[in-house]
Amino acid sequence: MLAGVGATHTDFDPLPKDATATLLDQVIGSAGTTGSIPETIPGGWSNHLRVGLVWDTRDRETGTHRGTWSEVLVQAVPEFFGSESGYVRWTLVDRRFVPLGDRLTLANRVIVQNVEGEAPFYDLSIIQTSFKQREGLGGGRTLRGIPRNRYVGKGLFLWNAELRWRAADFSVAGRPLHMVLSTFVDTGRVWADGLVPGEFFSDLHTAYGGGIRFGMGENF
């Protein structure tokens, strides 16, 4: 079980007038003067209270071969705590590591998140975890190969599947090293106004690829 508090302040620096329009500029332009987005742009404080439950049965934290790491997190951002607007973010995370032999591991992660209330635009990109808040759907920690923070909304669904093969163990200068080859598929989506459970598997943004990693011992 975990509990804590945090404080975040966000500022904006305007782009030069001759700069290319950003995605945010395009959204504001399409919303018009009566839209809700322009009112949430100036920046400010987002101070929060957080509680959660964590279940961790991994055999080791790095290079996990088997086990489960699941989280249920609730983050309240109340106005009485000094925030510019009040809202609640809840997040469900389930990570499972399935051994397929001594050197092969199937790793899966599912994240479902929703924001209830009027969160400012700059807070909608946050994906909360018990360890560290991440930013956005898109980028090396969510949808690999897609630009960071590319998709933003109140509701979020993400699924990562990765097959990892510990291909070789060797040593350099007396230090134990290993090489891991992997292939992955990442898929997910957002909803502007909140989760729609019946649409989890429609209009998905998908990326796939592979990689190579080198590790030292069992800790790095």
Summary of predicted features, one role per range:
Residues 1-104, 184-186, 190-193:
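Transmembrane beta-strand segments of outer-membrane beta-barrel domains in Gram-negative
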Residues 68-220:
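C-terminal transmembrane beta-barrel domains of outer membrane proteins
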